[in-house]
């Protein structure tokens, strides 16, 4: 399991590209430089300890959310194929600083989830994970039954995020929490 206080998943390795060790990745990041700027990246297989790799080159495929990248030491298709399905990580301390009112999705993990009933805020659960395939779904564990529900992270459903006060406010449509 990834320690979200230390690591951020920024991409998924989907396939080799060609015969010279190039790798096709699916981006889970809004920052293209994570795949185009040379430097350290980490690759994680399953829940194993991440392994450091040196990104030497990368470019975005036109009209796609995927990139073609090259890692130092990955020189042929077989080596690239062995990385298929693994996650590309960066260290949280290397994450770009954001403007006031902005936050990284990983900061949402462990926040309390509140709803408003009769003008009172009530804690109904906790954000325990993210399901981020460009859909930005919050995995919330409900207090009443320990059930996990997926909540779309959109302004209409999550209008308030207060990192300092450790909560998000939900305004779920009828039935969303019962799914």
Swiss-Prot record:
Source organism per UniProt: Prochlorococcus marinus subsp. pastoris (strain CCMP1986 / NIES-2087 / MED4)
GO BP terms in the entry: ribosomal small subunit biogenesis; rRNA processing
Entry GO terms, CC: cytoplasm; ribosome
Keywords on record: Chaperone, Cytoplasm, Ribosome biogenesis, rRNA processing
Pfam families, per the entry: PRC_RimM, RimM
Annotated SUPFAM superfamilies: PRC-barrel domain (SSF50346), Translation proteins (SSF50447)
Protein name: Ribosome maturation factor RimM
Record lineage: Bacteria, Bacillati, Cyanobacteriota, Cyanophyceae, Synechococcales
TM helices/strands, residue ranges: none
Domain notes: The PRC barrel domain binds ribosomal protein uS19.
Stated role: An accessory protein needed during the final step in the assembly of 30S ribosomal subunit, possibly for assembly of the head region. Essential for efficient processing of 16S rRNA. May be needed both before and after RbfA during the maturation of 16S rRNA. It has affinity for free ribosomal 30S subunits but not for 70S ribosomes.
Superkingdom as given in the UniProt entry: Bacteria
Compartmental location: Cytoplasm
GO molecular function: ribosome binding
């Amino acid at each position: 399991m990834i320690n979200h206080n230390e690591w951020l998943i920024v991409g998924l390795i989907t396939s080799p590209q060609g015969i010279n060790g190039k790798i096709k990745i699916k981006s889970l990041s809004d920052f293209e430089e994570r795949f185009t700027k040379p430097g350290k990246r980490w690759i994680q297989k399953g829940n194993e300890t991440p392994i450091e790799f040196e990104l030497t080159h990368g470019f975005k495929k036109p009209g796609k959310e995927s990139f073609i990248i090259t890692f130092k030491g990955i020189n042929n298709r077989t080596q690239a194929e062995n990385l298929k399905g693994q996650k590309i990580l960066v260290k949280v301390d290397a994450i770009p600083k954001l403007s006031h009112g902005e936050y990284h999705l990983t900061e949402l993990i462990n926040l309390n989830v509140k709803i408003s009933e009769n003008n009172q805020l009530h804690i109904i659960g906790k954000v325990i994970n993210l399901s981020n395939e460009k859909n930005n779904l919050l995995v919330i564990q409900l207090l009443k039954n320990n059930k996990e529900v997926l909540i779309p992270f959109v302004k209409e459903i999550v209008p308030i995020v207060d990192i300092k006060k450790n909560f998000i406010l939900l305004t779920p449509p009828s039935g969303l929490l019962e799914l």
